[in-house]
């Protein structure tokens, strides 16, 4: 009997640990140098779109290459110096989830290589999700567990990268 209680306790601890790892959206992103998706060529995040504009004006707007910031090894473009300053004050709040990698692709695989379309996006619970097409972006509103699956896959991917 003691053995099965121990097993049960270990299961509870494992599930609790997984919940803390995934975080249910409450955790900060685990981003490191080199995690930002800059496409196959160049070093520009979000194909040059202003990550702050998604939050402040609710639109995908192309940033000005003359108004930029460097963060985590990527160059970020902005439509105004005000947006750049907001980003630099708290980049994790404005950076897209999963380093800008395709969010719905991340929900299905830990090694996403899908191109993104910065015009295919959603802000859900204060977090920016970028997808590869409008239909996929809209799925984040309609398929409840996509974000949880993507968060779990991102955690696995980050753990895998850290152990390499």
Which residue stretches match the model-derived regions?
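Bacterial N-terminal signal peptides that target proteins for export
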Residues: 2-13
């Amino acid at each position: 009997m003691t053995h099965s209680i121990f097993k049960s306790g270990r299961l509870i601890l494992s599930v609790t640990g997984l919940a803390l790892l995934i975080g249910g959206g409450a955790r900060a992103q685990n981003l490191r140098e080199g995690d930002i998706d800059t496409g196959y060529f160049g070093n520009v995040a979000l194909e040059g779109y202003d990550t702050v504009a998604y939050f402040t004006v609710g639109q995908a707007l192309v940033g000005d290459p003359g108004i930029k910031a460097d963060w985590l090894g990527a160059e970020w473009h902005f439509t105004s110096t005000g947006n750049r300053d907001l980003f630099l004050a708290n980049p994790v709040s404005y950076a897209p989830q999963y380093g800008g990698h395709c969010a719905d692709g991340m929900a299905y695989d830990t090694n996403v290589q899908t191109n993104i379309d910065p015009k295919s996006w959603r802000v859900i619970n204060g977090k920016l999700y970028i997808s590869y097409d409008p239909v996929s972006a809209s799925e984040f509103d309609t398929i409840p567990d996509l974000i949880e699956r993507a968060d779990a896959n991102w955690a696995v991917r980050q753990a895998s990268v850290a152990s390499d």
